Amino acid sequence: MIDTFVIFYKTSNYNTKDVLSLPGVIRELTRKDFDGNLRLCVKPSLFIKKYSSTESSNNKVLCNLKEALLVKDYFDKKIGEIGELRRVDFAYDTEIHFNENQKLNKFFISMLLASRNSSLNKIFFFFSNNTSLNMKIKNKTMEFSIYNCNDKDRLGNTRYEQRFTSLRGLDNFQNKILKSLNKYDKELCDLTSTIPVIETYFSELIYNEYQMSKNKYKNLHEFIAKMDASNFILTKNVFKQFFEKISDGNVDFYIKNFRRKRKDALKFITKLEMETLIKKIRIAIDKTK
C-alpha cells in the first residue's frame, strides 16, 4: 500500500506556511528551493483520516493508488497547478519485531541485491553492526528499506518499503506507478531463483572469515557461535557448504550436537518462510492497484 509521495510544483506564488497547514503534509520534508519551486511531501492516509468520518479510515495509515491520486488532485487544485510526482513509497508492514527476524530480513534484502545485479559485497558492510534497526539499498531509480517501526503509527512493527524515484513527468501518473508496481511484483515473483547465489556467497564469506580469524577463537564451536549470532548462517545449505570445506564430519550430527549445547542456536531460514514473506508483499501490491 502507499505510504508517502513527493510532488514538485514550479509555482512560487503559494505561501509555504499555507502549504504546511494542509492535512497530510510532512512539514520537515516540505520545502522551497532557491528558485521558489515547491517540494511537497505528503502522507495521503493522514489527509484521508482528516476528511473521512468512517471508523475504518480513522485507523488507516496506508492507502491504495486510487485514494493517493485523489489526494494529489486535491493538492493540485489547492495550489493551482498540476504537480509533478517525483516519488512514491510503497510499504508492507508485519507484526513481527525487527530484531526477531534479522536473518530473514538479511536474506530478503540480499536476494534483492542479487536480482538487481548489485554487488553482494555491500552486505557485509550493511550488516556488520548487528544492532542496526535499518537495512537499506538504493540506486538512481529506487530505494528499498527494511526497518523497525514499532515506535510509530504503523500497522506493524517492521516495515518493508520500496521507494519509486523515477516517476518524473506531468502525465500518466497512474500508469507510471502501476508500471513500477508491476515491475516490483515481477521481481518478487522471480526472487527465490537467487537463493543458490546468496547461499554460496554467505558460505564463502563465512569460510574466508574462518581462514583469516580462526586463531582468534578457542575452537570451531566458538567460531560458529559467533557467525550464528551475527546472522550470517542464513540457511542450512549455507552452513553445510561451509562445514564440508573444513570438516569430514556429519553435518546433521554436528548441528544436532551444537543445538544441544546452545539453546535456540542455528535457526535456519527455510524456502517456505521466504516464499510466505514474498507472497504477503505481493498481496499488498495487488491491493494497492
Question: Which residues make up each language-model segment?
Answer:
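Structured, helix-rich domain cores that form ligand/interaction pockets
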Residues: 1-246, 269-289
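Short, solvent-exposed alpha-helical "recognition" segments
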Residues: 257-275
